[in-house]
Each structure stands twice: as C-alpha cells, then as structure tokens.
C-alpha cells in the first residue's frame, strides 16, 4: 500500500509539473524515495526475525521480500536470467546442488525459482550481515558454521526434515565460491541429505554470475541457470557420497 501511494504521488507530480525540465529530477528523486522506502521496509521486517532462534521453516513473506529486492536490483544492473530446464524439477521436495561462482548465486537461484519456494544452506557469515542477514534467516535459509562439524550435521538433519515436508533446499557442495570458474573439491557429506530424505537430487549449473559485479550498470549481463539433470532417489540410494559427488561433477562439467 505504501508503494502504491508513493507511486501515485510521483505520477501526479510528473503530470502536474509546470516545468518539463524538472521531470528528470522528479523521476530520479522518486527512484531514490522508492529505494529508501524499500530499505525501511526491509529494516522493519528484519526486526521480527530472531537471529539466535529463527523459525526453521521460514516464512513466505520474507522470500517475497527477497524476490522484490532482487528483481529491481537485476533490472538496475542490466542483468538477465536465462533459466533452462526448470520443467525437469520434480513436484514435492528435492535437494538442489550446483557450482558456486558468485556471492549472487543463491539469491539469483531463489529469484529464478521463486515459484518453488527454494531456500539455501548458507554460511554463517551471511546471516550476520545487518538487516539482510535476518531477512535471509526469515526466508528459511539455514545458517551453517563451516568450522563446527556437529552443527553441520544438525543442519543436514534440518534439511532432511524440510525436504520430507515437500520443500526444495539448495546446497553448494564446494562450500565456497570458486574464483577461477573451475569446480573446487566437494564436501561430500551434503549428498547424505538426499539419501536420508529419500528425495530426487537436482543438479543446477550456473554460468557467468561472476560477471554481475564486474559489469553492473556498465554493460548487460546474462546469467544462465541450467537444470542439467534430476537424479531419482533410486539411482543414488546405494551409492556412497564420493560416487554421487563424482557423478554430479561430471554432469556439471559437460
């Protein structure tokens, strides 16, 4: 409602402006006002998320907030998302894994697959970012302390429970973004989540997301997200995690 009111006010100001030369200034001021209003909405919404004990399932409201933030950000930066193969994704819960090339990867995938309510396991450091960290937790993303194996096991168990309840959860097996574009060694334990949840394993390949920051505002960028394969549970049920990891690696590099 606030956005609608401000939008109508801006439209009125543009239409009634006695000096056409002022219209660009009014427009730029309007964009700034909308941006500040959106930041205020995010800041207020973040206050309702307990960083120490967030709701393990998250809330659709916060996922919509992320989508409402990422969409304009991509448009402003002249970034286009090319999603290929989404029709392969199964109904119900599944584990999504893929390569990790940029800090933008999780939110880009969440935005592209926003109709599926996708959330991610994210490193603990991301959840300590002012305002954004609480929004991330509020959306249902799970905080992982990479230095604590016991906490990591607890997170995997949470992933399993949520997938069994029909959710789509994403994990980057590399554990961190690759600065060279080449796949890093996998942390094989994450594949256990698909075996324990008895769910399909979807493989998502991300291309050119590392160019977003480099090209932002300067030139158009197309980020390609390709669902390369969906491995049914029956195919991975009796494999060890190293075998699953090698299969995923082959899929991502072909």
Predicted regions mapped to residue ranges:
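Catalytic core of membrane glycerolipid acyltransferases/transacylases, capturing the structured
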Residues: 46-67, 75-76, 90-148
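Generic preference for hydrophobic
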Residues: 83, 96, 120-121, 225-227
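Short acidic-hydrophobic, aromatic-tinged amphipathic segments that line or gate anion-handling sites
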Residues: 83, 142-145, 233
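Residue-level "edge-of-site" marker
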Residues: 87, 149, 207
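Non-catalytic C-terminal accessory region of glycerolipid acyltransferases
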Residues: 20, 153-254
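Membrane-anchoring hydrophobic helices of lipid-metabolizing enzymes
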Residues: 1-10, 18-93
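Structural motif corresponding to alpha-helix initiation and N-cap regions
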Residues: 83-86, 129, 153-156
């Amino acid at each position: 409602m606030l956005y609608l009111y401000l939008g109508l006010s801006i439209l009125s100001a543009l239409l009634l402006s006695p000096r056409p030369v002022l219209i660009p200034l009014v427009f730029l001021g309007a964009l700034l006002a909308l941006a500040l209003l959106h930041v205020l909405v995010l800041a207020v919404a973040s206050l309702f998320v307990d960083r120490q004990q967030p709701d393990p399932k998250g809330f659709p409201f916060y996922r919509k907030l992320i989508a409402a933030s990422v969409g304009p950000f991509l448009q402003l930066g002249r970034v286009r998302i090319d999603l290929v193969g989404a029709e392969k994704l199964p109904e119900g819960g599944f584990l999504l894994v893929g390569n990790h090339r940029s800090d933008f990867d999780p939110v880009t995938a969440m935005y592209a697959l926003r109709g599926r309510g996708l959330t991610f396991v994210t490193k603990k450091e991301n959840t300590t970012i002012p305002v954004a960290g609480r929004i991330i937790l509020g959306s249902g993303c799970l905080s992982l302390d990479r230095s604590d194996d016991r906490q990591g096991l607890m997170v995997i168990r949470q992933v399993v429970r949520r997938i069994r309840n029909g959710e789509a959860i994403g994990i980057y097996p590399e554990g961190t973004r690759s600065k060279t574009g080449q796949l890093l060694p996998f942390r094989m334990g994450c594949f256990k989540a698909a075996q324990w949840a008895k769910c399909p394993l979807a493989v998502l390949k991300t291309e050119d997301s590392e160019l977003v920051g480099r090209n932002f505002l300067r030139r158009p960028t197309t980020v390609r997200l390709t669902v390369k394969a969906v491995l049914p549970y029956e195919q991975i049920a009796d494999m060890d995690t190293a075998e699953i990891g090698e299969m995923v690696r082959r899929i991502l590099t072909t």
